[in-house]
């Protein structure tokens, strides 16, 4: 999962006073913002769905956020991609902002258009403090995106062991699969991060679970040429002759991708052609 931050592009249809307000939030001039907000709707959304509160969260303007709530700002209004202010705080790793938004009624399980919760995005961006605050506030660590990915999948994909530990200690399930049938071990086998693989195996992840194509984590290691990963999997009981849906075992995958060292390793352990 790769997330692109909001660009905050402006339409020529936006009023000059609205654009000035946005700039005032960016530079942190609260008194000027108060003047500009006189007689306006604090919950007005521009063509991208942004509100003054949304912008204040992005720029980490705590004083603006608190003032906007005094004016009746809606904490859960999302932009045109479904991102709420809490999503933005998670992306930017703003634990104090997260607490403020949560105290004002922010939906901790809100999903954007891709099904990502704030915790998904914190995990994806490596925002440890934000993730910790969300978990402590009761965020569901096993929530799935539209692709079936969990926050654990995201933290594994980004090789963040601290976040993985946090999620595991908070009840993250190792065996959950994304829409392609891939577990967290499939993901780490692709990325080639040995310490994370060892940690997941220590926690009891099932090593021979197949994805939707019938391929195991060892198939992935063979595909990407991760020799030490393949060795680790074999010593932990990986089935060296497991066949995918197309009938290919890890050794066939290694041959197809030119990973000769892995071919030799599999032959050493008795892999059949």
Residue ranges of each PLM-predicted region?
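Ankyrin repeat structural motif
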Residues: 29-37, 61-69, 94-102, 127-135, ...
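Ankyrin-repeat-protein effector appendages
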Residues: 8-23, 170, 203, 236, ...
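Intrinsically disordered, low-complexity regulatory segments in ankyrin-centric signaling systems
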Residues: 8-38, 47, 58, 70
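Ankyrin repeat A-helix N-terminal signature
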Residues: 23-28, 55-61, 88-94, 121-127, ...
């Amino acid at each position: 999962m790769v997330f692109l931050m909001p660009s905050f592009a402006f339409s020529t249809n936006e009023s000059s006073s609205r654009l000035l307000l946005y700039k005032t939030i960016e530079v942190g001039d609260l008194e000027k913002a108060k003047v500009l907000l006189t007689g306006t709707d604090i919950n007005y959304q521009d063509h991208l769905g942004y509100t003054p509160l949304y912008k204040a969260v992005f720029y980490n303007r705590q004083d603006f956020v608190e003032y906007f709530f005094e004016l009746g700002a809606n904490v859960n209004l999302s932009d045109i991609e479904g991102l709420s202010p809490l999503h933005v705080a998670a992306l930017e790793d703003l634990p104090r902002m997260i607490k403020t938004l949560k105290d004002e009624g922010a939906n901790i399980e809100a999903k954007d258009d891709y099904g990502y919760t704030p915790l998904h995005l914190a995990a994806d961006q490596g925002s440890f403090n934000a993730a910790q605050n969300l978990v402590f506030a009761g965020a569901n660590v096993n929530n799935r995106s539209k692709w079936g990915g969990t926050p654990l999948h995201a933290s594994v994909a980004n090789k963040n062991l601290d976040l993985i530990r946090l999620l595991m200690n908070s009840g993250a399930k190792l065996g959950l699969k994304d829409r392609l049938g891939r577990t967290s071990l499939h993901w780490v086998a692709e990325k080639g991060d040995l310490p994370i693989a060892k940690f997941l195996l220590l926690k009891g992840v099932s090593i021979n679970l197949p994805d939707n194509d019938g391929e195991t984590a060892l198939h992935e290691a063979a595909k990407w040429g991760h020799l030490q990963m393949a060795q680790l999997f074999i010593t932990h009981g990986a089935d060296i002759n497991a066949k995918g849906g197309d009938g290919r075992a890890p050794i066939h995958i290694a041959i197809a991708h030119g990973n000769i060292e892995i071919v030799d390793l599999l032959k050493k352990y008795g892999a059949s052609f």
